[in-house]
């Protein structure tokens, strides 16, 4: 028999060749060869040991991947090689075997191989089935690692070793205590356990009351300024009065006691004359001479100066409060009627004010007794001084809103006119050439 057919464990037929024929088939990888190597110890001779060694070598080379349907062919290949090694043409010096023994040995080996395939078939299936869950577990492990790498809160964790805590060197612990903004939430405190702040209601109420008082004072000062506008030289007078007040306070401390006696008398007199001045202001029709004449105001200011102030303050008040007759007339005649009220100074209400209120440290507030209605001042000024209406018209005309219109020069048009001697046709031709 040249060819032997034998049936595998799954019903597929494999073809085996006799001794002396070489096979050029390369063994394909297989996963479960340990059963095959365990079933071959029944063979005898050194040639069989050489076959066992080659089977183990092929087992080491064929551990990657393979199909179970090609395993009987691999077994047949190993058997053929074994037969080829024990062929009658090849004789070892130690032992010579006749050809009849080799034929019987091949039959025995085929039977043994078939039995080993029957035994090792279920084991190989079990190995293959056990390999599948291991591969699936490996895939799941790789997927979980990829998901873990992609589920990091932010790339800020991988900036360097400074970001990681030495107390928690593991990344999982670090992620447990850190969020995406790298805030340490482990040391956070609940709001209920936080220390209570002090009661700020008293502070807020006091600040609101102070704000209301200040707002009222500002409103009163604005209303007083709206009723009686401040004079243009009010800042100069305020500075002079402040300096005078400081000098008066210094003179009280160092001055002789005779000044105190002289101060008490005019205060009593001022208290007596105070109601008369208040009745005049409340009536709304005061005398024109008492309000507007600079001579009466000068006399009153000199009386207050001699009674209340020491000697060194006389030149200061002469420069600041008393206006000469010529300068006052020039100012009043050169200004319109609306500006006349600013230059009138009435010092009559000063008499009913105490010495401390006469020279206050702060000159931003206006006393209500000093407020004079503007209508009465305008009536008195219209009776005493005649305003110059032409100057008012000049001021209106010199406003920046009105501008003179520019006139076009008729001579400019004559420059472009053609000459009288040359006709129009010739001019058109010359223009076309140029």
UniProtKB/Swiss-Prot annotation:
Residues 64-76 have a biased composition (Polar residues). Keywords: Centromere, Chromosome, Chromosome partition, Kinetochore, Meiosis. This is Meiosis-specific kinetochore protein. Interacts with CENPC. Interacts with PLK1; required for recruitment of PLK1 at kinetochores. GO terms for biological process: female meiosis chromosome segregation; homologous chromosome segregation; male meiosis chromosome segregation; meiotic sister chromatid cohesion involved in meiosis I; meiotic sister chromatid cohesion, centromeric. Its main location: nucleus. Key regulator of kinetochore function during meiosis I: required both for mono-orientation of kinetochores on sister chromosomes and protection of centromeric cohesin from separase-mediated cleavage. Acts by facilitating kinetochore mono-orientation during meiosis I, when kinetochores on sister chromosomes face the same direction and are thus captured and pulled by spindle fibers from the same pole. Also required to prevent cleavage of cohesin at centromeres during meiosis I, possibly by acting as a regulator of the shugoshin-dependent protection pathway. Residues 1-102, 249-289, 404-424 are annotated as: Disordered. Disruption phenotype: Infertility due to defects in meiosis. Mice develop normally and show no visible phenotype but are completely infertile (both males and females) due to defects in meiotic chromosome segregation during meiosis I. Monooriented kinetochores split prematurely and sister chromosomes separate entirely before anaphase of meiosis II. Residues 391-394 are annotated as: Required for localization to kinetochores. It comes from the Eukaryota. Germ cell-specific. Expressed in both testis and ovary. Not expressed in other tissues. A motif (POLO box domain (PBD)-binding) lies at residues 334-336. GO terms for cellular component: condensed chromosome, centromeric region; kinetochore. It is found in: Chromosome, Centromere; Chromosome, Centromere, Kinetochore. Residues 46-62 have a biased composition (Basic and acidic residues).
């Amino acid at each position: 028999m040249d060819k032997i057919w034998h049936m595998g464990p799954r019903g597929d037929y494999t073809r085996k060749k006799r001794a002396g024929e070489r096979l050029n088939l390369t063994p394909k990888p297989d996963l479960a060869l340990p059963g095959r190597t365990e079933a071959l110890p029944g063979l005898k001779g050194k040639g069989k040991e050489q076959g066992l060694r080659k089977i183990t070598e092929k087992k080491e080379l064929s551990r990657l991947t393979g199909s179970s349907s090609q395993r009987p062919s691999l077994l047949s290949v190993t058997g053929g090689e074994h037969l080829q090694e024990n062929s009658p043409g090849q004789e070892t010096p130690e032992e010579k075997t006749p050809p009849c023994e080799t034929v019987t040995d091949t039959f025995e080996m085929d039977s043994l191989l078939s039995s080993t395939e029957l035994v090792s078939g279920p084991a190989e299936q079990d190995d293959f089935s056990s390999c599948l869950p291991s591969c699936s577990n490996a895939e799941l492990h790789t997927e979980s690692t990829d998901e873990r790498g992609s589920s990091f809160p932010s790339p800020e964790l991988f900036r360097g070793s400074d970001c990681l805590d030495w107390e928690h060197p593991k990344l999982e612990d670090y992620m447990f205590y850190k969020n995406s903004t790298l805030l340490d939430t482990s040391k956070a405190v609940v709001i209920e356990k936080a220390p209570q702040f002090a009661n700020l209601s008293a502070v807020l109420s006091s600040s609101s009351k102070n704000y209301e008082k200040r707002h009222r004072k500002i409103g009163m000062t604005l209303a007083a300024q709206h009723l009686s506008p401040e004079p243009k030289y009010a800042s100069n007078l305020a500075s002079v009065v402040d300096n005078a007040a400081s000098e008066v306070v210094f003179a009280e401390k160092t001055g002789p006691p005779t000044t105190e006696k002289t101060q008490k008398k005019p205060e009593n007199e001022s208290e007596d004359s105070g109601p008369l001045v208040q009745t005049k202001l409340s009536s709304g029709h005061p005398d024109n001479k008492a309000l507007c004449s600079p001579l009466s105001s000068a006399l009153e200011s000199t009386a207050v100066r001699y009674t209340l102030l020491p000697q060194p303050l006389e030149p200061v008040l002469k420069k600041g409060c008393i206006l000469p007759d010529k300068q006052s007339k020039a100012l009043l005649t050169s200004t319109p009627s609306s500006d006349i009220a600013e230059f009138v100074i009435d010092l009559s209400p000063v008499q009913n004010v105490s010495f401390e209120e006469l020279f206050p440290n702060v000159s931003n507030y206006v006393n209500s007794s000093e407020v004079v209605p503007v209508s009465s001042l305008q009536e008195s000024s219209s009776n005493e001084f005649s305003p110059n209406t032409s100057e008012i018209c000049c001021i209106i005309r010199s406003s920046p809103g009105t501008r003179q219109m520019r006139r076009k020069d008729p001579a400019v048009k004559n420059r472009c006119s053609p000459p009288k001697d040359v006709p129009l046709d010739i001019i058109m031709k010359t223009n076309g050439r140029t």
